[in-house]
A protein has these predicted regions:
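Short, low-complexity Pro/Thr/Gly
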Residues: 1-519
Length: 519
């Protein structure tokens, strides 16, 4: 008798809890028939062609045409130009696809239904996407470390130092995530749905190097300052104009942008049912509060949020980041991606300053030109004799030590106080940065990103816990910013960006769609 039969015979009372009165079989596949449908991606042009400028944000409006029965996932299309440079290193900012979008909203007959922000889109993708999904997401928005490349001058202007690239930026509105939440355009006969997109000014989207100082040093294109030091006019390119600087590198840029929308077409029976039936959709919305110019030490802030909130997400940013377009550095360290290693400097993105100690000699590679592993070969003089450090695969070097600050969290601790009572006791920043993300999210987040969840499963559409902020009169957030004794930047100022994800109901009745709960 085969041994497998002996296992089946060995049954006891405990097995009744597992196999008594079974309701499923693992050896008979059961499927469900589905209603017929089809899908098609269609480009939606803006009502007027947006004109992107270096110094001002640009707003574009896009009517959602009823090209299909339902509207599912949508994307912002944006064409990055080819970059030509024979003298100045040029680099797009990290996650430029997210940074391009200052904010975007979906409206019904002019009523704002939901509003999203490019910076939140970046951090939320860090929180919710698996490593595989995040890799593809970064490919679409030009966000991963191996895509953010610096255009090293090539000696002529014939061929682009950086090629052009079309970005596909996923919009995170409620109807884009789950097909069961798709927006029923067929039922909105008397409602004009519209996307509004505010694009970031161009000067916030790139950095350029100054060969008069060092090929690796970068400065902000807007105020032409290098790490808070005014640059001399003699170091600037002839005819340099900060209001038009991007067009020195980008040639014949058509500045194309549009909305890519996935329309769903239903079978006749289901189409009729959708058109004649009232609908109520449980949707998610995003709230944002910004607190500017916080000093080191304790702060007490009023949240002023509304509706049932399932999760709070926040980050701090040193105001120095605005001077170097270092938008997604949420730490108190100029080089958060450079880690200490005894033998090898591993892959990193240089943001401002790196000091490497080799046999007690200092090699100061300042700037943002190093985008891959830094190859330090036998002699320090070999590196210093080069105009550019070689961008090669890094190798372990004997007797070499790298010295760098920890990435310095900005927030030391925090707590919530509702109507004068502690919602939870004061907790360290590492609790919000690590434990909360580990327990409630799929992704790993990023350094300096903090989370507090009221929900058991905040990533799912099914609600599993909220805090109704509308019923709490006084909402206070107490936080404490590190004041480290050995930190030379003790007078720095910080901005806090606080986001709350809440639920609301979008009701469609008589061809008109509107929110059920409004302030």
């Amino acid at each position: 008798m085969p041994g497998g039969y002996f296992q089946l015979i060995a049954q006891g009372p405990a097995d009744l809890y597992l196999t008594g009165n079974p309701s499923i079989s693992f050896f008979k596949f059961v499927y469900r028939r589905y209603t017929p449908f089809s899908m098609e991606l269609i480009n939606l042009p803006y009502n007027t062609i947006p004109s992107f400028t270096p110094t001002q944000s640009t707003e574009a409006k896009c009517n959602i045409d009823r090209n299909g029965d339902l509207l599912h996932d949508c994307y912002v299309i944006y064409d990055l130009p080819a970059i030509y440079t024979a003298d100045y290193p040029f680099s797009w900012v990290e996650s430029i696809g997210n940074k391009i979008i200052e904010e975007t909203s979906i409206k019904a007959n002019g009523q704002n239904i939901d509003r999203q922000f490019g910076e939140f889109m970046k951090v939320y993708s860090d929180l919710t996407l698996s490593s595989t999904k995040k890799e593809k997401y970064d490919n679409m928005i030009n966000g991963s470390n191996n895509i953010i490349r610096t255009a090293i001058p090539t000696g002529d202007d014939t061929y682009p130092a950086l090629p052009s690239k079309r970005l596909f930026i996923p919009l995170p509105f409620w109807h884009c995530k789950n097909s069961g939440q798709s927006l029923p355009l067929i039922a909105l006969q008397y409602t004009q749905m519209r996307f509004d997109v505010i694009y970031t000014r161009l000067n916030d989207l790139f950095t350029i190097g100054n060969p008069g100082v060092s090929p690796e040093e970068l400065f902000n294109s807007d105020n032409l300052s290098q790490y808070n030091q005014d640059m001399r006019d003699t170091l600037l390119a002839e005819g340099w104009d900060q209001t038009n600087v991007i067009f020195r590198f980008a040639r014949n840029w058509d500045q194309y942008s549009a909305i890519l929308a996935n329309y769903i077409y239903l079978g006749e029976d289901e189409r009729t049912k959708f058109a004649q039936t009232s609908h109520e959709y449980l949707i998610t919305q995003l709230q944002r509060r910004i607190y500017l110019g916080l000093s080191r030490g304790p702060s007490r802030l009023d949240l002023v949020m509304n509706y049932p909130v399932k999760e709070l997400i926040w980050f701090f940013r040193n105001q120095d980041a605005y001077k170097t377009n270092d938008w997604f550095n949420f730490t108190d360290n100029q080089c958060p991606d450079l880690l200490n290693d005894v033998k090898d400097i591993r892959k990193f993105i240089m943001t401002k300053c790196l000091q490497t100690l080799i046999d007690n000699d200092t090699c100061d590679c300042s700037g943002n030109g190093l985008k891959q592993k830094l190859n330090l070969s036998n002699q320090l003089s070999d590196l210093l004799s080069q105009s550019y450090a070689g961008l090669y695969e890094g190798v372990s070097v004997s007797n070499m030590n790298s010295s760098q600050w920890d990435y310095y969290s900005i927030m030391k601790d925090a707590k919530l106080v509702f109507n004068g009572h502690d919602r939870f006791e004061e907790r360290l920043g590492t609790y919000f940065e690590n434990q909360q993300i580990y327990k409630y999210h799929t992704g790993k987040g990023c350094r300096g990103l903090y989370v507090y969840s009221f929900s058991l499963k905040p990533e799912r559409d099914q609600p599993s816990g909220t805090c109704n902020m509308s019923r709490i009169d006084t909402q206070q957030f107490f936080t404490n910013i590190f004041d480290t004794d050995n930190n030379p930047k003790e007078n720095d100022k910080f901005d806090l960006h606080m986001f709350g994800i809440n639920y609301n109901v979008f009701r469609i009745m008589g061809g008109i769609g509107q929110l059920v709960f409004t302030n």
